[in-house]
Amino acid sequence: FSPGYSVGYLAQEPHLDNDKTVKEVVMEGVQNVVDTLAEYEEINNKFGLPEYYEDPEKMDALLARQAELQDIIDSMDAWNLDSKLERAMDALRCPPEDQLVKNLSGGERRRVALCRLLLQKPDILLLDEPTNHLDAESIDWLEQHLQQYEGTVICITHDRYFLDHVAGWILELDRGEGIPWK
């Protein structure tokens, strides 16, 4: 892949930090958004400090940074992070957000990893059997999500019904040879 593109990979057996909660793992996918919101909040808290409101230069710098962050937050649609997180976790039937990863089954771990990856929004998604461990409603949500996905999605799957709903075109790999398939 060309430099500058982000790639996200869903493995069949994802490696997750066993000491974290479900929500902490999912939030890893949007850490840049969380950090930006935290910096914005930190700047807003500084407006009430005398060292800033009594110094016009510091206040101007603070206002300029706040405006930059506001633009970044708006472009990432970060104000809706909590609702996006809740919607994705619910649609993929993730376990309760406070549950420790070490107590999850293989299927639950995979749903958590998929949720984290989809919220991360990499330029290129590599999905290895993405419908494994998903119920029909979760598969339907995933199909709709991938149909609207702004990046490139590459799926390795045996689920032809799923492929029919999400694939723009299919490349069948057989003994090292790629064959376009319609």
Where on the chain are the PLM-derived regions?
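ABC ATP-binding cassette signature C-motif
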Residues: F1-K182
